[in-house]
Amino acid sequence: MSEPFMNAPWQPPGDHPALKSPQPTGILIDSVRKLYPARKASAEVVALDDISLNVPKGSILGVIGRSGAGKSTLIRLINGLDKPTAGRVVVNDVEITSLDEPALRRARRSIGMVFQHFNLLSSRTAFANVALPLEIAGTPKAEIEKRVLPLLDMVGLADKRDRYPAELSGGQKQRVGIARALATEPAVLLSDEATSALDPETTDQILDLLKQINRDLHLTILFITHEMAVVKALADRVAVIEAGRIVEEGATFDVFATPRHEVTRRFVSSVTGSGAPDWLLAQLQPLQPPGGKAVLRVTFKGSDASQPLLSRVARTLGVDLNILFGQVEMIAGHPFGTLIVSLDASPDVLRQVIAQLSAGNNLVEQLGYVA
């Protein structure tokens, strides 16, 4: 990893629940606020409001939020491009927020950055773009050659070393950007919407590459995104940011399986299809019409997703369960499924059906009725 440097005294994290972790800390964000003062006709802007996060070393945290939620401000504070109004940012045991400019420049060598629009120099080849941070750091030419060639090989561009950005595809440009971010052998990798300018197939390839880098180099990765599909594919943990505050944070599977905040539920629904399809929503009624059927949404988590629960309930209670919609997928290595069913049952039998379907980790919601 990067060379040692003098750093400001670091103190253990405070008492905020988000800061407690049994693992060594890669990134610590402790009670951070960022205010932009009022200017002329513009009022004061609270960009970040009491943000606390603990990213264990070697883990991958996804920070998701809508435009203007505070994601970009957060990443600027982590890499020292801006300072918080209050609170601390600690990266690889170095308190970034208290460093002077020379120490901050040294500290940034332990932080790699991947950008949305690649930020490659058009006049430099792929090799020269990756070599740039090493040249700036004064690394000897022979050492640069030893460092850059394996990185180009790692990202699958060994045969493109002499190509210019104009000769590369979007995915290849981002691979150059990733190799450049790794050139100084950082302990932490930050990613700012690294896949949002790419097509779906290339996005999957870049996410696979980031997972491989995390495994092989044991890097701590923090990425920001507005796409829950990226979180699902890459993150160990996810933090949801809204209006400058963390509204939900936890293991990726837990957040997908049991989203607590309305913003999180909207993000999750966009990926898992756990929301009812439009054609069904158009038919749902809040009150039971004559001859109408109740509509239930059953969310299965973990091992419960592979159990024959519907057939068991149908046999036990003597009811017919009509499947209107369903899917099962893997999230963070765990199965997660959603089924929407309709049934014709008395209120008493309906209560029994809901009780039996709610066994284990399942979540059952009555959505309404259909004619």
Swiss-Prot record:
Record region (Disordered): 1-22
Pfam families: ABC_tran, NIL
GO MF term list: ABC-type D-methionine transporter activity; ATP binding; ATP hydrolysis activity
Binding of ATP, residues: 65-72
Highest taxon listed in the record's lineage: Bacteria
Subcellular localization(s) per the UniProt record: Cell inner membrane
Membership in a protein family: Belongs to the ABC transporter superfamily. Methionine importer (TC 3.A.1.24) family.
Subunit structure, as described in the record: The complex is composed of two ATP-binding proteins (MetN), two transmembrane proteins (MetI) and a solute-binding protein (MetQ).
Role according to the record: Part of the ABC transporter complex MetNIQ involved in methionine import. Responsible for energy coupling to the transport system.
Protein name, entry field: Methionine import ATP-binding protein MetN
Gene name linked to the record: metN
